[in-house]
């Protein structure tokens, strides 16, 4: 299945909307580090994201150590950012 890649203008609008997110150096993904009070809160966040990811069939790349969750969003079928990444980033923000 081919997924449309975001245009530069769409990508820039997304980053303006979500200022905590940054464009990865290669321009093909967005990244964010979430920090929580403790491991339980970080894990709870990851559980909420995981349920959403399964429902939408779009999964983040992430790394967790104690209260920190590092997230990378990209769409392999688009070879870069797509609306699916934008939707996932917005969902993650709503789970805070």
UniProtKB/Swiss-Prot annotation:
Cited Pfam families: Pterin_4a
Name recorded for this polypeptide: Putative pterin-4-alpha-carbinolamine dehydratase
Record GO biological process: tetrahydrobiopterin biosynthetic process
The enzyme's E.C. designation: 4.2.1.96
GO terms of molecular function: 4-alpha-hydroxytetrahydrobiopterin dehydratase activity
Superkingdom, natural source: Bacteria
Protein family: Belongs to the pterin-4-alpha-carbinolamine dehydratase family.
Catalysed transformations (reactions): (4aS,6R)-4a-hydroxy-L-erythro-5,6,7,8-tetrahydrobiopterin = (6R)-L-erythro-6,7-dihydrobiopterin + H2O
Keywords per UniProt: Lyase
Coiled coil: none
SUPFAM superfamilies xrefs: PCD-like
KW Lyase (keyword) present: yes
Gene3D superfamilies: Transcriptional coactivator/pterin dehydratase
Lineage: Bacteria, Pseudomonadati, Pseudomonadota, Alphaproteobacteria, Sphingomonadales
HAMAP family assigned to the protein according to its UniProt record, in alphabetical order: Pterin_4_alpha
